[in-house]
Amino acid sequence: MDTIRSYIAKARAFFAAHRAARIAGYILAAWLVFVLVFHPKGTKTFLLLGMDNYGSLNTVGRSDVMMLVQVDFTRADISTVTFARDMFIPDENGRKQKINTIVRQSGEEALVTAMENAFQVDIDGWFRVNFTTVIELVDAIGGVRIDLTEKEARYINRNTGDYEPLVEGKNHLNGDQALVFARCRQLDNDMGRGERQNKVMAAMVAQTKRMTIANVVSVFSSLKHAWVSSLSGFEQVRLLGNALWLRGAHVNSIGMPLGNWKYANSGVEIKMEENVQLLHEALGLPAPVFPDKK
């Protein structure tokens, strides 16, 4: 006990005699409090809806992107799941509907309810963005680096403005180019487009490691009109603060359907139980529970 008291007394004497050491100690203590109190923990899941229109977010177009975003703040890990927009799931009345039809006819909350019931996931909120959002945010963070095939590079060059031509391999895309890349399905199908959307999201997260102070200021300026959300203003501010801990986080990209499916009735019909099981495994969720068919 005397030894401990002696060490404490010596430490007090040292800090009393050295002003710089006292300041450094205060800063270290404040940083530790910040880490322990404000470092986000746990997992949140959000539904991201991308509309096929420019300008005001009050104008609701057709849903061009259906993406579930699971954020693990404890491990700094993000999983994105893109859903084929013409996939059939039961709506809130039990009728099979395409997911983009549900949101267009009944709104975001109805789609959240339908997806929670169909896939047995808890969704903490939704965000609606549009083409303008993607362009402005990608430009604000300084563009994104994406590996392109020769066909993808040619497609983007044909469908964007007078920019330096892109080539096969690693390219730096601006907002216009990233949007065209994310929307492209002419080269393959809706599943391919979903994979490209996941690549853009992963590239945006990776780019946060390289952002300058000017980029950060530009991002916060863009966020004033970036989306419409079910979250309150306070919840959005807190989420943005939490997102600072995710700079350069690992992104795991998934495309639904994961299991058996077929194209029928002008849409994607899936084997629900198999796909739900695979989705839960991919996201590290508890095993789903299905009704007894006996």
Residue ranges and their predicted role:
Residues 2-294:
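Non-catalytic, solvent-exposed segments at the cell envelope interface
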